[in-house]
């Protein structure tokens, strides 16, 4: 990802050189940019029959493939808040309980850039799984 950035975002200098595997440093103004993973959330939602809710992606990347509900946390939003928002946006379901399970480093390929992510997985309970309806990034659930 660092290879995509050629100029310092502070002073515009072309002397914006890779200083480690996760950073570039400007030789003119001293600014150092670190690439850190973006926070992503994933929901495991089981209905009363023990069936896992999956959705089909409406958009690229990976349009048409199966996926779990979830997405990125927005600025000033906790991972749990982002999880609830993403599940509501994509499925119309209201998360009433989210239990953290595990996390996994990942890469999200978007607009020609590999964005490092830290995906956090949650087992979720929802208010009424009969109200599931694909919206936003989900073509179908």
Predicted regions and their residues:
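Short functional micro-motifs and their immediate structural scaffolds
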Residues: 16-17, 34
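Short metal-coordination and nucleic-acid-contact micro-motifs, chiefly zinc-binding Cys/His arrays
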Residues: 1-5, 22, 39
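Short cysteine-rich clusters marking metal-coordination/redox-active sites
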Residues: 8-11, 26-29
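Short linker/helix segments within small regulatory modules
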Residues: 17-23
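Active-site-adjacent beta-strand/loop module that shapes the phosphate/pyrophosphate-binding cleft
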Residues: 104-131
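Conserved N-terminal beta-strand and adjoining loop/helix that marks the start
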Residues: 28-52, 72
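Conserved Nudix-box catalytic region and its N-terminal flanking loop in Nudix hydrolases
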Residues: 47-89
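NUDIX/MutT-family hydrolases
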Residues: 133-141
């Amino acid at each position: 990802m660092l290879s995509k950035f050629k100029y310092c975002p502070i002073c515009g200098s072309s002397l914006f050189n890779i200083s480690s595997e996760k950073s570039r440093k400007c030789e003119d103004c001293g600014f150092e940019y670190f690439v850190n993973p973006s926070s992503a959330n994933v929901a495991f939602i089981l209905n009363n029959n023990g069936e896992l809710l999956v959705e089909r992606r409406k958009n690229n990347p990976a349009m048409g493939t199966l996926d779990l509900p979830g997405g990125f946390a927005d600025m000033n939003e906790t991972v749990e808040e982002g999880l609830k928002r993403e599940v509501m946006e994509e499925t119309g379901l209201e998360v009433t309980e989210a239990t953290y399970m595990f996390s996994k480093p990942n890469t999200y390929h978007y607009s020609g850039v590999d964005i490092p992510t830290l995906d956090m997985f949650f087992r979720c309970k929802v208010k009424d799984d009969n109200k599931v309806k694909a919206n936003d990034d989900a073509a179908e659930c």
